Amino acid sequence: MLGDENGEMSTIPGLNQIQFEGFCGFMDRGLTEELYKFPKIEDTEQEIEFQLFVETYQLVEPLIKERDAVYESLTYSSELYVSAGLIWKTSKDMQEQTIFIGNIPLMNSLGTSIVNGIYRIVINQILQSPGIYYRSELDHNGISVYTGTIISDWGGRLELEIDRKARIWARVSRKQKISILVLSSAMGSNLREILENVCYPEIFLSFLTDKEKKKIGSKENAILEFYQQFSCVGGDPVFSESLCKELQKKFFQQRCELGRIGRRNMNQRLNLNIPQNNTFLLPRDILAAADRLIGMKFGMGPLDDMNHLKNKRIRSVADLLQDQFGLALVRLENVVRGTICGAIRHKLIPTPQNLVTSTPLTTTYESFFGLHPLSQVLDRTNPLTQIVHGRKLSYLGPGGLTGRTANFRIRDIHPSHYGRICPIDTSEGINVGLIGSLAIHARIGHWGSLESPFYKIFERSKKAQMLYLSPSRDEYYMVAAGNSLALNQGIQEEQVVPARYRQEFLTIAWEQVHLRSIFPFQYFSIGASLIPFIEHNDANRALMSSNMQRQAVPLSRSEKCIVGTGLERQVALDSGVPAIADHEGKIISTDTDKIILSGNGDALGIPLVMYQRSNKNTCMHQTARVRRGKCIKKGQILADGAATVGGELALGKNVLVAYMPWEGYNFEDAVLISERLVYEDIYTSFHIRKYEIQTHVTSQGPERITNEIPHLEAHLLRNLDKNGIVMLGSWVETGDILVGKLTPQVAKESSYAPEDRLLRAILGIQVSTSKETCLKLPIGGRGRVIDVRWVQKKGGSSYNPETIRVYISQKREIKVGDKVAGRHGNKGIISKILPRQDMPYLQDGRPVDMVFNPLGVPSRMNVGQLFECSLGLAGSLLDRHHRIAPFDERYEQEASRKLVFSELYQASKQTANPWVFEPEYPGKSRIFDGRTGGPFEQPVIIGKPYILKLIHQVDDKIHGRSSGYYALVTQQPLRGRSKQGGQRVGEMEVWALEGFGVAHILQEMLTYKSDHIRARQEVLGTTIIGGTIPKPEDAPESFRLLVRELRSLALELNHFLVSEKNFQINRKEA
């Protein structure tokens, strides 16, 4: 049985363990594997031999710390040194030196790499596992056609087909196919060997014609026939070594290299015993595959399910980094060969250090982290986002699928995903189902398969034994589907339980169960596991919720959720956001930027993150939680980070909510809020924006940073220091200069002032002119300057320009247009902010904070929000925090409702407030209109759910255009806020205006104000004076563009006036 056995109680594994273990696997095994593949390199005359001694390779500790690498925009990497020897064969002398091969970017304990100062993460990819797969499809006549597809390690495919006459063909391209006998002969088998190694020789002999015999008479004839069919070459090609090399490169290397996983799969599927180190496709494989295909034709053996996880493999971080390392070594080999040849040609004495350069390895990894689709910038919106990003699984990327070509069956949930890939958490849109998320307990096995843990059930003993099973193994067992908690193993099991067996879901007796799940969260990803009462929600809304939690903005004053699932602490700790003590000791002092801890007689300074910007412009900040003189233990929390409180994840706020319509202001998911949320900074967040400018050396001279900028008003330069850079702590508004910069340029003779011309004519003095190219604060960027960085790269050439970065902090209260959401997919936009006295209020006089539309619940089927809402109210009144595991209904029916009502009843008794739990309408209460003081007609659900403020904020989206840039070709306004673009009056907008018959407005929108070059210059003036826009004589630019397009197709479009008289004459003549 595949899997590790562990008798201990299961705990949730480290949530970033997948990434970190993958990188450690690359450093332990992948690095040496690729170095051992590096060949011995000889010169053309075979006098000198170069080789690497892998056993003595060294990785040097990084010269800089992670924090400094981020601050100075450097790569956090380690230098790789290997011993190399140069052997002179004539004298048998050897020169050995330790050479520097290049830098390898390191991974930190959170599973991320720092490249050029940016946190990056490598996504795990799901690929079709190499091997052979049999399937059946109906042709156009409705007859089943059986095919066997051999998939190589590189993703290349070779298809075997069997036709109606039981002849077997190998399809080498979309249009060409050749006989299986020709392919086997071209691979080195003769007819006798073929017939001896197959189970059905009579079928092979049945389609062996005289023509076929001639083709496979010799290996050369078979290769020529194969080449002719594969390359679609006419005539009679001649057998040569170059022809064999071309076939080897184009066909055999791409479609016949199985790799170690492919060899294992082929051996298992075809019952072969070929050694594991033989990773290429052999004639034995082809013949065994053909035999099995014949068996399939006659109904022997099962077909393969291509979407089953046993037929998939995970290309992990280790595989991707190892592939890149191998590619870099191939490039290094070419460099060494070229250098040796050059040294001998110029009669120089080479040394190992002179032959090797670090450029191939360093540039390969830089381009991989910068350009590869599976290497992404780490999303650092909040702590949950950082962890979830590293646990993604993607079907996309090199060798994988694309969003356009993937069909529905690939995107759909498969029974083998159970406990391995979350059935809920995926992206929305074109990539739905193609980007998934690992289940909490899943891990990547040795052969690249996803493994999930189960408890093995013993009949006579209560001892628990934990096994990790791959997808190919667990379908042979009866698996009980989460019928008890791991924490409560002593519970008497039910007589009949739901179970899974061979991809079917059954109900069986408990005595028949072999394995059971270890935890209720086992099937879900981290995002879905943070949703309380998830079993009461529709899966589509749970999907939205797990995505929206990743978009929550860290608030200035975070707050724990009253109702949670218990995973909040683990997520916060594994994200690395809180500061945690590495060893026990005593706090000597605490400051805003560091904590000093004494342990074993030494004082250790622990730096804290201070107002650091994430790549989504959110503020990362740590606040000390320990006081001076306090003794702490190892693992204790020293400081809370963004969106964490007491070491628990805290993404939002517990606010008082009523579900009721209010004057139409919460129509269609709009949300009504109280001004208390603004004035008391309940949903206030800090955002840090980065603005940068570079200084180059131009052909006219270097650009200058200065505070003396001509022709600019003084108040725009008020914040600059003597160097021309904005001062720390300055408050800046839109249009202010952040960095003053002048770029030299040559002026035309006509642009000189008269006195400048005189100086040139008499004294020959060249008057220099400069263009102002300052960094200005764009619209919506007002705030406080909190940091200025001047990054100077080594060797300040024109290719390495100096960069000045200015960081500005903004304080954003919640406002109309911001997006808020709960944890059940209930999202909405703030429509109105009401005064406190106008909000509906409870029977104890408290006004509610938010009013949601109750119609958003029934049709969306996310009833979990109502359970959370009521339990949150009870928890706030009783001062309790609830942690609810999912699927609690397995203990008793209506368990969730009983829990909520019992807590409400207890809160009602303890606080002496009968309105908290009224038996006539439990969970609801009579509330009053704040404007009139009268009660509303119907009782209303009130409660305290956990509401998040999302990163989709109105300040980043609102945009207006009065003047701006135009496209060069169409002369129409550009598109998008970043380009100061305009709104497009599209086809449907035109229909709406046509419905009202507003011809003049339509003409203005489509011509004068858009792409009529002359008319748009007169629009502003005529609007100010109240006149009418003069009617232009010529056509708008887009019409002229159409005319030019038609001319390019040799179609001339002319217009001329036809009078009524001429029209009648022409009609009479006709």
From Swiss-Prot:
The keyword Transferase applies. GO terms for molecular function: DNA binding; DNA-directed RNA polymerase activity; ribonucleoside binding. CDD domains: RNA_pol_B_RPB2 (cd00653). Signal peptide: none annotated. It is found in: Plastid, Chloroplast. It catalyses: RNA(n) + a ribonucleoside 5'-triphosphate = RNA(n+1) + diphosphate. Its main location: plastid. One of its GO terms (cellular component) is mitochondrion. GO terms for biological process: DNA-templated transcription. Its EC number is 2.7.7.6. It comes from the Eukaryota. InterPro entries: DNA-dir_RNA_pol_bsu_ext_1_sf (IPR042107), DNA-dir_RNA_pol_su2 (IPR015712), DNA-dir_RNAP_su2_dom (IPR007120), DNA-dir_RNAP_su2_hyb_sf (IPR037033), RNA_pol_bsu_bac (IPR010243), RNA_pol_bsu_CS (IPR007121), RNA_pol_Rpb2_2 (IPR007642), RNA_pol_Rpb2_2_sf (IPR037034). The keyword Plastid applies. Keywords: Chloroplast, DNA-directed RNA polymerase, Nucleotidyltransferase, Plastid, Transcription, Transferase. Belongs to the RNA polymerase beta chain family. In plastids the minimal PEP RNA polymerase catalytic core is composed of four subunits: alpha, beta, beta', and beta''. When a (nuclear-encoded) sigma factor is associated with the core the holoenzyme is formed, which can initiate transcription. DNA-dependent RNA polymerase catalyzes the transcription of DNA into RNA using the four ribonucleoside triphosphates as substrates. This is DNA-directed RNA polymerase subunit beta. The lineage of its organism: Eukaryota, Viridiplantae, Streptophyta, Embryophyta, Tracheophyta. The gene is rpoB.
